Curated annotation (Swiss-Prot):
Gene Ontology cellular-component annotations: nucleus
PROSITE patterns in alphabetical order: NAC
Keyword Transcription part of the UniProt annotation: yes
Major localisation: nucleus
Ranges in coiled-coil conformation: none
Cellular localisation: Nucleus
Signal peptide: none
Name under which the protein is recorded: NAC domain-containing protein 4
Length: 359
């Protein structure tokens, strides 16, 4: 329902109860109120998901909904207030809604609730819940009107909504078991970020280059999946002997990918590989870089190898970097695009350092 500029749907308490809530409960034809206020199960959605369910789109941080009263227990009048992310907590006393004209009788009640996270911390989401009182003993008031308000900034609504969508996507990704019964897990790729010391990457072989223009990412990955080969290789990197070379400073660190976003970090396994090094980025000069790939048939899941690197170096000695296979882990094909993206990012980082060293 599109609204003209300046239009506001702001009924007062009496109008909400008399002109919307009571007809919704008592009239046989409720189309005249349903086209203004949508009916939802409030506790089936998080507060930040409710604005998209509103019949009238508002940027003022106020939305109206009809909701069915759902009791927490079979006996008593305690309503269900809990959602997946938190719960609605009643604050203050129940207020009476009176008819301002005529006999000024009581026509309903209003309760104020605040949404709290699971840990009990308050949020900026507030709800005014309206209940119509029965004028006659046989009247059943099934519906309530929920006036949902957001007291924070508008940008916080969009960020909360995005976070909810991401959580939903992650919940849809199932854990898969391989044919051998081992549980599938994800592959974590890590990178080295240079700090105050400068480093040079040189002689990167053409096999590690990925041409996005010639081969689309999806097609190249499908080709990798459909390869029937069953080969596994451990690649040893040898660095040339330099008798005149002395390491600048001993460095020990963890390879981390600062460029990865929250989506990627949620998808991967919490297992990380730490890499101990005893030289700076400059010690990687004249090294040959190759990417080891583990291939499997399309009928089986893809196997990825987590690698740890042990580096031993001294003046006048040959540096040997061995990559040991820690374990073969199967992953679902739906996660293949994520793994490819992480490897692609690693290769791009190496190319950037290589380009800097050439200038």
């Amino acid at each position: 329902m599109m609204n003209p500029v300046g239009f506001r749907f702001r009924p007062n308490d009496e109008e909400i109860v008399d002109h919307y809530l009571r007809p919704k409960n008592l009239d046989s034809d409720t189309s005249h109120v349903d086209e203004v206020i949508s009916t939802v199960d409030i506790c089936s959605f998080e507060p930040w998901d409710l604005p998209s369910k509103s019949m009238i789109k508002s940027r003022d941080g106020v939305w109206y909904f009809f909701s069915v009263k759902e009791m927490k227990y079979n006996r008593g009048d305690q309503q269900r207030r809990r959602t997946n992310s938190g719960f609605w907590k009643k604050t203050g006393k129940t207020m009476t809604v009176m008819r301002k004209r005529g006999n000024r009788e009581k026509i309903g009640e209003k309760r104020v609730l605040v949404f709290k996270n699971r840990d009990g911390s308050k949020t900026d989401w507030v709800m005014h819940e309206y209940h119509a009182t029965s004028l006659f003993p046989n009247q059943m008031m099934t519906y309530t009107v929920c006036k949902v308000e957001f007291k924070g900034e508008e940008t916080e609504i969009s960020s909360s909504s995005t976070g909810s969508e991401i959580e939903q996507i992650h919940s849809l990704i199932p854990l898969v078991n391989s044919s051998g019964g081992s549980e599938g897990s994800s592959f974590h790729s890590q990178e080295l970020q240079n700090s105050s010391q400068s480093g040079v990457f040189a002689n990167v072989q053409g096999e590690s280059q990925i041409d996005d223009a010639t081969t689309p990412i999806e097609e190249e990955w499908k080709t990798w999946l459909n390869n029937d080969g069953d080969e596994q290789r451990n690649i040893m990197f040898m660095q040339d002997h330099r008798s005149d070379y002395t390491p600048l400073k001993s460095l020990t660190g963890v390879f981390s990918d600062d460029s990865s976003d929250d989506n990627d970090s949620d998808l991967i396994s919490p297992k990380t590989n730490s890499i101990g090094t005893s030289s700076t980025c400059a010690s990687f000069a004249s090294s040959n870089h190759q990417i080891d790939q583990t291939q499997h048939s399309p009928d089986s899941t893809v196997q990825l190898v987590s690698l740890t690197q042990e580096v031993s170096q001294g003046p006048g000695q040959v540096t040997v970097i061995r990559e040991h296979k820690l374990g073969e882990e199967s992953v679902k094909k739906k996660r293949a695009s994520f793994v490819y993206r992480m490897i692609h990012r690693l290769v791009k980082k190496i190319h950037q350092c290589y380009s800097i060293s050439r200038t």
